[in-house]
Amino acid sequence: MIKNPKVLILTAHYGNGHVQVAKTLEQTFRQKGIKDVIVCDLFGESHPVITDITKYLYLKSYTIGKELYRLFYYGVEKIYDKKIASWYANFGRKRLKLLLKAEKPDIVINTFPIIAVPELKKQTGISIPVYNVLTDFCVHKIWIHREVDRYFVATDHVKKVMVDIGVPAEQIVETGIPIRSSFELKINPDIIYNKYQLCKNKKILLIVAGAHGVLGSVKELCQSFMSVPDLQVVVVCGKNEALKQDLVGVQDTNPDALKVFGYVENIDELFRVTSCMITKPGGITLSEAAALQVPVILYKPVPGQENENAMYFERKGAAVVIRDDSEVFAKTEALLQDDMKLLQMKEAMKSIYRPEPAGHIVDTILAENHVEPNHIPIKSPALAQSFT
């Protein structure tokens, strides 16, 4: 039995999702009395220049590099068992060895497909449990290694795919993808309507435009949607200040029809009152939407995990996938007018959702390492003016 385990969570800043999952797991461990938790961006610390370049290319995949990313994602999948596996296994290895020597963790968790730890286990024989927390509704071979002790996955579908390619079923646990605890709280929606100056008698369209310009023609879309009767449009621009300033001028022409925000800390509040949402199909965003049963319109998924996520939600009846700019307004307006379709999509989201995934993952890890959790009660946060 380990009395006070040290937990090392490895992640990477490719998008916010992997880091967000790492922080959610860190918070959950701490809530269960495990105080010694370290979150490390292994690639960023090991190779900062290469990491910055690849992060830039990753973001460009949303605009000009879609075919390149398609080739990378599906090409690596096909040839992964060859030379790339050997090169990738050693990426970050030097920094990892120093980290393991200095921190001496009892448990290692990956929220990004980092195989340096299991590869080090294979080559050196070190005894340390390794857990992979997959952050999409699909699986890439790069996540899989014989020295990983357990995988936590979003759905039974992902589990079946992994079993089909040789991962023992008993090593895979279907938990859902960890999301922020705020998405699992109960909040009176009237408070939210008042806070954001929204009308509960109108439908609300939430557009999550993001900081990297992943949604095109936002200004023109907003102008079109503002003409739809009994509809309020809410746009979250993230840290894209230029987009926010561009939309504020549109908002001023009819502030009741359009609400524009920058970064919204408690974005779950907007999820709770929206009729449907236009967004990109990241695994964490979709998990959060499922938790609050928000029908989603998925805009032009990037080939790779985003496209796989989108196709899964589309098959389940929880999403409308749009691949052409010219279809955005017409398909969104049609959905907003189809109450039966919206209800069916909400039910589909409900069927996808797995409650308290972070708690399930942490409890499983602690139990397997014979650690008795010491629950620390956390008060529900009050609604705050946490938007810009």
Swiss-Prot record:
- Pathway(s) per entry: Glycolipid metabolism; diglucosyl-diacylglycerol biosynthesis
Taking the first listed entry, what is the main subcellular location of this protein, grouped into a coarse class? Answer: membrane
Named from the GO MF annotations, one term is:
1,2-diacylglycerol 3-glucosyltransferase activity
List the SUPFAM superfamilies hit by this protein, alphabetically: UDP-Glycosyltransferase/glycogen phosphorylase
Q: What is this enzyme's class at the first EC digit?
A: transferase
> What CDD domains does the record tag this protein with?
GT28_Beta-DGS-like
Spell out the subcellular localization from the entry: Cell membrane
The entry's keywords = Carbohydrate metabolism, Cell membrane, Glycosyltransferase, Lipid biosynthesis, Lipid metabolism, Membrane, Transferase
UniProt-listed Pfam families: Glyco_tran_28_C, MGDG_synth
Q: Which InterPro entries match?
A: Diacylglyc_glucosyltr_N, Glyco_trans_28_C, Glycosyltransf_28_UgtP, Pro_diacylglycrl_glcsylTrfase
Gene Ontology biological process: enterobacterial common antigen biosynthetic process; glycolipid biosynthetic process; lipoteichoic acid biosynthetic process
Give the highest taxon in the source lineage.
Bacteria
Q: Which reaction does it catalyse?
A: a 1,2-diacyl-3-O-(beta-D-glucopyranosyl)-sn-glycerol + UDP-alpha-D-glucose = a 1,2-diacyl-3-O-(beta-D-Glc-(1->6)-beta-D-Glc)-sn-glycerol + UDP + H(+); a 1,2-diacyl-3-O-(beta-D-Glc-(1->6)-beta-D-Glc)-sn-glycerol + UDP-alpha-D-glucose = a 1,2-diacyl-3-O-(beta-D-Glc-(1->6)-beta-D-Glc-(1->6)-beta-D-Glc)-sn-glycerol + UDP + H(+); a 1,2-diacyl-sn-glycerol + UDP-alpha-D-glucose = a 1,2-diacyl-3-O-(beta-D-glucopyranosyl)-sn-glycerol + UDP + H(+)
EC number, UniProt record: 2.4.1.315
A GO CC annotation recorded here is:
plasma membrane
The free-text function statement in the UniProt record for this protein reads:
Processive glucosyltransferase involved in the biosynthesis of both the bilayer- and non-bilayer-forming membrane glucolipids. Is able to successively transfer up to three glucosyl residues to diacylglycerol (DAG), thereby catalyzing the formation of beta-monoglucosyl-DAG (3-O-(beta-D-glucopyranosyl)-1,2-diacyl-sn-glycerol), beta-diglucosyl-DAG (3-O-(beta-D-glucopyranosyl-beta-(1->6)-D-glucopyranosyl)-1,2-diacyl-sn-glycerol) and beta-triglucosyl-DAG (3-O-(beta-D-glucopyranosyl-beta-(1->6)-D-glucopyranosyl-beta-(1->6)-D-glucopyranosyl)-1,2-diacyl-sn-glycerol).
Q: Give the similarity note.
A: Belongs to the glycosyltransferase 28 family. UgtP subfamily.
- What this protein is called in its record is Processive diacylglycerol beta-glucosyltransferase
